[in-house]
């Protein structure tokens, strides 16, 4: 098993510590992880290849799990270990040097993930590495501002685009604006979202092309699919 495969998919829900407590649902050689950020402004699901026996694993401290995995070499083995009760209570992680144990938690200690009521989306656009790199650079240049707004418009050349503005839209604030080609039927409202959450989602999925769908009701959906994993996120607008 490749360490990089495991780490990259954990990071898709961990989002640089925005989510720590999750349940890994193992079925048919795949792990399905539903999650919510601690601030409850985003929920999502990550599905990836994980050749382990079927069952549910309660991960209370994803940051501790990542720290353990990150000291290993690229080729690792992961096994499930049962305690005296016959229930799985540890993840055993091994490489050619280390034998590591990660203690699993009681599944009832993991908060339930809120359900998302999807709606019709008013515009959508594609994202790739060029978009992600540009967004991260702009966010860093503004010292990781909290605000990002999106709205659609049609250029003088007749192109439908989404305008993305990092920073406050007030006249005297520092901000970065850029556009991407978008699909929509009518112009949208100006919709505010968390720049920090969007940043971490994009950073965790760098290297995978995706799509962003936005509703004027204040819901953003992001989807990233590859041969080995699928990631889906819902971010709610800021007030």
What are these regions (language model features)?
Residues 102-103, 114:
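Short, charged, solvent-exposed linker or helix-capping segments at domain edges/interfaces
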């Amino acid at each position: 098993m490749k360490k990089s495969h495991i780490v990259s998919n954990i990071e898709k829900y961990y989002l640089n510590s925005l989510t720590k407590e999750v349940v890994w649902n193992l079925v048919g050689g795949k792990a399905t992880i539903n999650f919510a950020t601690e601030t409850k402004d985003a929920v999502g699901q990550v599905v990836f290849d994980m050749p382990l026996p079927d069952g549910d694993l309660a991960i209370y401290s994803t940051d501790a799990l990542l720290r353990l995995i990150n000291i290993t070499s690229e080729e690792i083995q992961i096994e499930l270990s049962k305690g005296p009760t016959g229930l799985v209570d540890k993840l055993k992680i091994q490489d050619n040097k280390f034998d590591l144990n990660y203690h699993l938690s009681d599944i009832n200690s993991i908060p339930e993930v809120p359900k998302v009521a999807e709606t019709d989306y008013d515009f959508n656009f594609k994202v790739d590495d060029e978009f992600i790199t540009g967004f991260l650079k702009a966010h860093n240049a503004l010292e990781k501002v909290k605000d990002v707004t999106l709205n659609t418009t049609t250029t003088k050349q007749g192109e439908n685009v989404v305008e993305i503005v990092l920073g406050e839209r007030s006249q005297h604030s520092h901000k970065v604006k850029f556009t991407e080609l978008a699909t929509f039927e009518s112009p949208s409202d100006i919709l505010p979202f968390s720049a920090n959450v969007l940043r971490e989602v994009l950073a965790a999925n760098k290297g995978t092309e995706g799509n962003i769908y936005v509703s004027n009701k204040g819901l953003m959906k992001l989807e990233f699919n590859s041969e080995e994993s699928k990631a889906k996120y819902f971010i709610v607008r800021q007030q």
